[in-house]
Amino acid sequence: MELERYIPETLKKLYLYDDEHKGELITTLQVYLRNKQSIRKTADAMFVHYRTISYRLEKIKQISGINFDDANEVLAVSNGLIIYKMLKEIE
């Protein structure tokens, strides 16, 4: 589908990793962005220790190369998450 081209490659790598490893990195990323990139709020929302979130975020950066300091990249990833969810609902 044409919308798929708006999903950044960085995000596609993360989806693949999560599928292969039954991970929660995508969920962690969604909650982290929803909580304005606050590790503490993300940990509270997910009922895990903040160090768990820190570890997952490092893993996310390692796998995908996402730069959370780049506002344009964060916006592209946020939009990609929404588009991916929409495409899954259509299937």
PLM regions: where:
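Cytosolic nucleotide-utilizing catalytic cores of signal-transduction proteins
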Residues: 1-91
